[in-house]
Curated annotation (Swiss-Prot):
One Pfam family of this chain: Pyr_redox_2
Protein name, as recorded: Ferredoxin--NADP reductase
Cited Gene3D superfamilies: FAD/NAD(P)-binding domain
EC number: 1.18.1.2
Disulfide bonds: none
Quaternary structure (record): Homodimer.
Reactions listed under catalytic activity: 2 reduced [2Fe-2S]-[ferredoxin] + NADP(+) + H(+) = 2 oxidized [2Fe-2S]-[ferredoxin] + NADPH
């Protein structure tokens, strides 16, 4: 039988990493299981160079920097980390739970699920032959390689606006959105309007023009009208959000609300001993932000500790007095 852990955290993104660190502060024996080949979740994989604006105390923190800081913080302690393992099933037993993954079985007294939105895949640009062009992108790995280029960004949410503002500093940038209004943070929208980014609204992409495997022009059409324009470009970035899949979550016996795990004020799920934090969980008034998830993590940990050791207080000493 495998070693028994106090808390096993399913998910190695920002919330999972901080939950693991905080659990060590409570003297818990901790394990992290993640389906990805590296820690960090979406910030590390999808937007390592994007600025993250909702982490208190930082104004120019990138996804990669956030990940590295959280990993360095966690390295203060010894943590069992299992990567490239997909959780298939969770079964309750006498001492806690058995987690069956694609590689092994894990024994744990409690579980904290911090898997974000689950498996994620960008929403594709649905135009003919879009997937065949090498200069059509869904994420940015090294922004400096686009310096001096003509860049067109598609989308109207936070990611699209933030990337347009980032590209504007080094490239000739256009932003195409189907509406005159943007879904991004108001501050970012005001910054966009004051920038040199060429804003094309309300337009949608209608045709790709290319040669030798690269897009040379994007045709855009007015949403309610007959006007069309042809935009020259070197690179096209699609920011239509992501399709997420919770995979086997529906088979774990947890009460769900629209593919998210219902939790109470203790971050406890419908199964005693299993907790959830971050974007994967749902409760009335929930706001999906990294900052929110980082706050939920200690609540989940403290209640997990209390579940294991009922004589220990849910509210420990404050970290400043440890």
């Amino acid at each position: 039988m495998s070693e028994l852990y106090d808390i096993t955290i399913v998910g190695g993104g920002p919330v999972g990493l901080f939950a693991a660190f905080y659990a060590h502060l409570r003297q818990a024996k901790v394990k992290i299981i993640d389906s990805l080949p590296q820690l960090g979740g979406q910030p590390a994989i999808l937007y390592p160079e994007k600025k993250i604006l909702d982490v208190p105390g930082f104004t120019n923190l990138t996804g990669e920097e956030l990940t590295q800081r959280l990993i360095e913080q966690l390295e203060t302690f010894q943590t069992e980390i299992c990567l490239n393992e997909t959780v298939l099933d969770i079964v309750k037993g006498e001492e806690g739970f058995t987690i069956t993954t694609s590689k092994a079985k894990h024994q744990t007294k409690t579980i904290i699920i911090a898997m974000g939105g689950g498996a994620f895949k960008p929403r594709a640009l649905e135009l003919d032959d879009a997937e065949s062009y090498s200069n059509l992108h869904y994420h940015v790995s090294n922004i400096n390689q686009y310096a001096g280029k003509k860049v067109v960004v598609l989308g109207g949410g936070d990611s699209a606006v933030d990337w347009a503002l980032a590209f504007e500093k080094i490239a000739e940038t256009s932003l195409v959105h189907r509406r005159d209004n943007f879904r991004a943070l108001e501050h970012s929208v005001e910054e966009l309007k004051a920038s040199s980014v060429e804003i094309k609204t309300p337009f949608v992409p209608s045709r790709l023009v290319g040669e030798n495997g690269k897009i040379t022009h994007l045709e855009i059409s007015q949403v309610k009208g007959e006007e069309s324009q042809l935009l020259p470009l070197d690179h096209l970035f699609v920011n239509y959000g992501f399709k997420s899949s919770v995979g086997n979550l529906k088979n774990w016996g947890l009460e769900l609300n629209r593919h998210k795990i219902l939790v109470n004020s203790k971050q406890e799920t419908s199964v005693p001993g299993i907790y959830a934090a971050g974007d994967c969980c749902s409760y009335e008034g929930k706001i999906d932000l990294i900052a929110t998830g980082l706050g939920e993590a200690p609540t989940a940990v403290n209640n997990a500790i209390n579940h294991i050791y009922p004589d220990q207080k849910v509210q420990p000493k404050h970290s400043t007095s440890l």
